[in-house]
Amino acid sequence: MSSHIVTPGPYRATKLWNEVTKLFRAGMPLKKHRQHFRVYTNCFTASTAVDWLHELLKNNSNFGPDVTRQQTVQLLKKFLKNHVIEDVKGRWGMEDLEDNSQLYRFPSTSPLKPIPNRPTVMRRKSLSMMDRESFFKFRGSKKFDKETLENVDPETQESPVGSSSGETERSRELTEDDIHVIWKNVTLTHLQKLVGSASLEGVLDPAKVNPQFIVYNMTKVNKHGVVSLEDKTEDLPHWALSAMKCLANWPKYDSDQPTYLGFERDVFKTVSDYFYSLPQPLLTYQYYELFVNILVMCGYITTPKSQPGKRKNQEEPNCPQPAKNPYVNPANLFRSTEYLLLSLIRKEAIDEADSPMKEVFSSKTETKLDTRRVFRGRRVSDGDRLDGSYLDVSQAHKTDVPYGRLRPRSCSLEGNINNCAKSRLFRSSESLESCSSDKSNPETDSPLEPNLQSSLVSINTSGSSVSSQLSADLRRNNSRPARARPRSIGNLFDIEENREMSASSFSVHAPVAEITMRPDSTSSVGFRGLGLSSLHGSCVDVRTGPSFSRRCQSSLDLSKPAPARPPSALLTHQPEQSLLQPSLEQVAVEALQLCTLLLPPASRRKLQLLLRMISRMSQNVDMPRLHDVIGTRTLLVQTFSRCVLSCEEVDDLDELLATRLLSFLMDHHQEVLQVPVYLRNAVEDHINYLKSLSSCPGSAGPIPSYSFCRQISCQEFEQQKLSVSQSALADLLENIIKDKSMSVKEKKKKIKLFQKEYPDIYSRRFPTTESETQLFADKPKIKPPMLLSIKKAKTFSIRN
């Protein structure tokens, strides 16, 4: 018996149940067995059933080879509980099946479960209406075709019989609303299957998802993949878009315009002010929980290494739980048959001919190169810093640097300072050309060989001179009038002036995240050694001296993708374990790809343009420094994190989550914000499947369509309740009176019972006693003629 693929949709677990039970009953071999001196025919042992059903599930296209034997035993227990099978003595209803030689057989009843024709909520409402009090219930013959149309407009019921076939054909056609519902259901089903969750309850409310946004974001895009808005009032204003293009294509954008010192900082502030003026973040408050749970599900968290001799509690907030497997553990006992069946569905990539979801579970193989370097008795140079975060050298002397990953540089704007003049320290006008002549040999064993250290600038100056110079620069920077900002970005620009600074320790108030980029446009964000309660940590970041030239193509438009960049190595101090599991990185990209389709088109367009702008800015070597201390990439992430993700109730964890999400989106914006082709193919396949069912003459029936009653007021309902019920009872009394087949005695009995229960209706029918007596007036009896009786008697006597 051949199997067919159960497509995603409502009642999928029921369809899978029917499919498996059909195949099991049709193919399970039955034999004669002997047990306890008795012979049983057409039965099978439990171990044989487990073996056969296990092979069936592994070879079935709906489940796949990942089905375990324990899951098969659990499914057979559900079969025994639901009377798909029974033991040879006819017992069933319990899940006491074991993988042994116990004998079982198939019952004579059908194990298939009926698929409901309407949602459960409607059924509960209809049953509650049917259970209302109705005192006088009479049985009668009813036409079922009239009952099925009781909720339809009466004008459509009175249509002639000849047009019924045409109406059926028209009802099978898919409307625009039906197509929107298909888009919504397929998208949410793919997202639910991708994250491996039984349901999205508590994270996403499907009723609040607008399917028109999904269709618009999938279809209304330009050649660069950016959403095109029909309503231009929702688009970015012209001045904001021009400012974003200016920063993205710096310095070649509109070079004829006059510029001044600090022009790029003013433009950057203009763009940030615009995004902070929006009423909601770009990912909206509605989907805050959804995006946060995607990060948690994909393991985008850090787990600090436990120190020897200490036992940390896993429940503490500064020790996050390790990432869990997104799929249901097959060893668990499933109390629900639906969860058990859905857990058996195959999880690997499905063939293109079988399902359009061939790309959902594809994971990207990532090569990691670990190297161990120990730095002792060495001063931290300014080239060692990354994104403006530092570590006290006293710690570097005491502690060995653990394993680090070789990763490309996230930005070539930081870490290269001209050492010929101390007065130019931490200024935005510094150039990278000073280290262009100090290129390193690519065949060196370590990024920190002596020939590379010529490109690094040592801060071997007195603590007083460096501290005074830094304080002067900060006071000059803070002298400008600045717009009040939320604390998520305000701490980037505010540095404690009275804090002690030395040549070996510069403590910056805010930057706590190290963000790097991989050669294949993937990324990882390292939050190093920081509990959630203390955000002011310090770390050492060692950056290689050589830098390749990564210049933006200024002739391109802002909406075009950023150019590819060659890889380079970065050895980073990383005292924690892996940050993002490589096997789940592709899952996170595709999950965010589906989640961003739920956004309003205007928010999605702004998110696309913002991510393309900050991605280009972080890669542009010609971009002047936007802050004297903070690195360009860190400044971009911390500035726009609250503009992208934020919740209505601000908590302490909000900033870290928003920073991590924006860092991930920056490095994967081309994959996350592109239109998923597999989703479009899945919707088209589902629509074509429904159309083929409607056009097939031998199909099971039309597509089920639901009709609903017109809502009326309470007063009108009370009037209809009285009038309709009383008229029906009056008709009942009239039928009793006019019934000629009923005897007078029985008729009197029923009329008296009716008079007792409904005196008002009876008094309206018989207002006076005369009308009642007239109905039951005794009719005169006609006696037979006496002569005929005499003749009959005489004749009888003569014959005798």
Curated annotation (Swiss-Prot):
<dbReference type="GO" id="GO:0035556">
    <property type="term" value="P:intracellular signal transduction"/>
</dbReference>
<dbReference type="InterPro" id="IPR036388">
    <property type="entry name" value="WH-like_DNA-bd_sf"/>
</dbReference>
<dbReference type="InterPro" id="IPR008936">
    <property type="entry name" value="Rho_GTPase_activation_prot"/>
</dbReference>
<feature type="compositionally biased region" description="Low complexity">
    <location>
        <begin position="459"/>
        <end position="468"/>
    </location>
</feature>
<feature type="domain" description="Rho-GAP">
    <location>
        <begin position="281"/>
        <end position="321"/>
    </location>
</feature>
<protein>
    <recommendedName>
        <fullName>DEP domain-containing protein 1A</fullName>
    </recommendedName>
</protein>
<feature type="region of interest" description="Disordered">
    <location>
        <begin position="147"/>
        <end position="173"/>
    </location>
</feature>
<dbReference type="InterPro" id="IPR000591">
    <property type="entry name" value="DEP_dom"/>
</dbReference>
<feature type="region of interest" description="Disordered">
    <location>
        <begin position="306"/>
        <end position="326"/>
    </location>
</feature>
<dbReference type="InterPro" id="IPR036390">
    <property type="entry name" value="WH_DNA-bd_sf"/>
</dbReference>
<dbReference type="Pfam" id="PF00610">
    <property type="entry name" value="DEP"/>
</dbReference>
<keyword id="KW-0343">GTPase activation</keyword>
<dbReference type="GO" id="GO:0005096">
    <property type="term" value="F:GTPase activator activity"/>
</dbReference>
<feature type="domain" description="DEP">
    <location>
        <begin position="24"/>
        <end position="108"/>
    </location>
</feature>
<feature type="region of interest" description="Disordered">
    <location>
        <begin position="459"/>
        <end position="485"/>
    </location>
</feature>
